Amino acid sequence: MVAATTLEAVDIMGLMKLLPHRYPFLMIDRIIDIDGDDSAIGIKNVTINEPHFQGHFPEQPVMPGVLIVEAMAQTAGAICIRSLGASKPSLVYFLTIDNAKFRKPVVPGDQLKIHVKKIKKRGNLLKFACEALVDGTKAAEAEISAMMVTGD
């Protein structure tokens, strides 16, 4: 018999301890199903109260794709920092976006589930495959890379 693995979660207060981002640029509300720095699912509850909807677009609000990619990067960055515990770096810098595709508009009322999976790690450089889903349908995907740095 194989023992079941219990995956972990981080709420908004935990995220604010891990990430330097704050309103209006904190793009995730919580992270669930954390498996070390290998994978996780970030949750973003999209609401009309977000400032970007004032101009993108007032009559037909759509979440900007670049903010969906930022939510992917924040999810990946948070699990990287969390996996290091007390020896966490000062920052995780977003380095590249590859193969980004936007497949479905994300609108107020949607809940984004941002799946991130580590596909490569070399030293302090990491690469993740990411998908953002709404109701099980892929809204966006990208590969992102990041660099963890210390404040030394």
UniProtKB/Swiss-Prot annotation:
* Gene3D superfamilies noted in UniProt: Hotdog Thioesterase
Task: Report which reactions are catalysed by this protein.
Answer: a (3R)-hydroxyacyl-[ACP] = a (2E)-enoyl-[ACP] + H2O
Protein name according to UniProt: 3-hydroxyacyl-[acyl-carrier-protein] dehydratase FabZ
Principal location? cytoplasm
Q: Where is the active site?
A: 56
Cross-referenced Pfam families: FabA
Organism, scientific name? Mesorhizobium japonicum (strain LMG 29417 / CECT 9101 / MAFF 303099) (Mesorhizobium loti (strain MAFF 303099))
One BP term from GO: fatty acid biosynthetic process
Could you say which protein family the record assigns here? Belongs to the thioester dehydratase family. FabZ subfamily.
Could you say which EC number(s) this protein's record lists? 4.2.1.59
Domain of life where this protein originates: Bacteria
Its biological purpose is as follows: Involved in unsaturated fatty acids biosynthesis. Catalyzes the dehydration of short chain beta-hydroxyacyl-ACPs and long chain saturated and unsaturated beta-hydroxyacyl-ACPs.
Q: Which GO terms describe its cellular component?
A: cytoplasm; membrane
Which keywords accompany this UniProt record? Answer: Cytoplasm, Lipid A biosynthesis, Lipid biosynthesis, Lipid metabolism, Lyase
**What terms describe the molecular function in GO for this protein?**
(3R)-hydroxyacyl-[acyl-carrier-protein] dehydratase activity
Q: Which compartment or compartments is the protein found in?
A: Cytoplasm
Q: Which InterPro entries match?
A: FabA_FabZ (IPR013114), FabZ (IPR010084), HotDog_dom_sf (IPR029069)
